[in-house]
């Protein structure tokens, strides 16, 4: 399955993984409101953002079937907790945005996430093989949009007589068409978009971020309206309406 988002440039026959990033920050106040809405629907913040992102992608692509991937630690067994190693697996989250109201939609998003988590020990490669996906060098199999959430801070590290600060390297290798990384901090919610510059231009990402931010702001105002019609959640800015 390949997403139906409009591309700014023709998809090349072979993916080259050259990309760029854009960074945004949502306020601490908005983050608190989003947590409140998530709790009201028995969801996590990740589930809420996943639902919002899927709606934005759905409206941009005119598709109700939205597939994104997300990494998972895959340390479900207690014996694996103390071990040093890379156990990360990739989950495929397939959401249907055709729901009448917010409550029904977020219940669906929650179940999609829980079902994927329950099967996180199934290797992604095995899933691709089982689905008999026709492979292509122009895009990744099953999904081309990655959503992830950092659970550890990338803050500075202090050692005796040494101060270490993370430094971003030059250039950015984008493994997927789009990558959205969430960073929850004391000052709000950071959003980092990674995008394939062979497919999208910078203006497209600015637009996607603007629509996602508007939709999240609309979600934050639904604390007293858990059954709001899904179509009533606005993603367009005042200037665009």
Predicted regions and their residues:
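C-terminal reverse transcriptase regions that engage the nucleic-acid substrate
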Residues: 1
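Adenylate-forming
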Residues: 6-12, 19-206, 217-222, 232-235
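Short conserved active-site loop signatures built around small residues
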Residues: 208-211
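Short, highly charged C-terminal tails/helix-capping segments
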Residues: 227-241
């Amino acid at each position: 399955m390949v997403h139906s988002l409009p591309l700014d440039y023709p998809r090349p026959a072979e993916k080259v993984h050259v990309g760029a990033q854009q960074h945004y920050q949502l306020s601490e106040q908005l983050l608190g409101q989003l947590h409140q809405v998530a709790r009201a629907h028995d969801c996590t913040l990740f589930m809420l953002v996943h639902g919002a992102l899927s709606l934005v992608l759905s409206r941009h692509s005119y598709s109700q079937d939205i597939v994104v991937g997300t990494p998972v630690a895959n340390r479900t067994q207690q014996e694996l907790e103390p071990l040093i190693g890379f156990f990360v697996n990739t989950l495929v989250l397939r959401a249907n945005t055709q729901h009448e109201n917010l409550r029904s939609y977020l219940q669906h998003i929650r179940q999609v996430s829980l079902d994927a988590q329950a099967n996180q020990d199934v290797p992604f490669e095995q899933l691709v093989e089982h689905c008999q996906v026709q492979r292509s060098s122009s895009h990744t199999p099953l999904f081309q949009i990655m959503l992830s959430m950092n659970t550890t801070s990338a803050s500075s590290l202090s050692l005796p007589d040494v101060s270490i600060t993370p430094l971003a390297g030059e250039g950015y290798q984008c493994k997927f068409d789009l990558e959205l990384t969430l960073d929850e901090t004391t000052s709000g919610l950071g959003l980092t978009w990674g995008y394939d510059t062979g497919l999208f231009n910078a203006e497209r990402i600015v637009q996607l971020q603007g629509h996602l931010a508007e939709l999240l702001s609309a979600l934050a105002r639904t604390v007293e309206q858990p059954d709001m019609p899904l179509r009533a959640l606005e993603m367009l800015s005042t200037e665009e309406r």
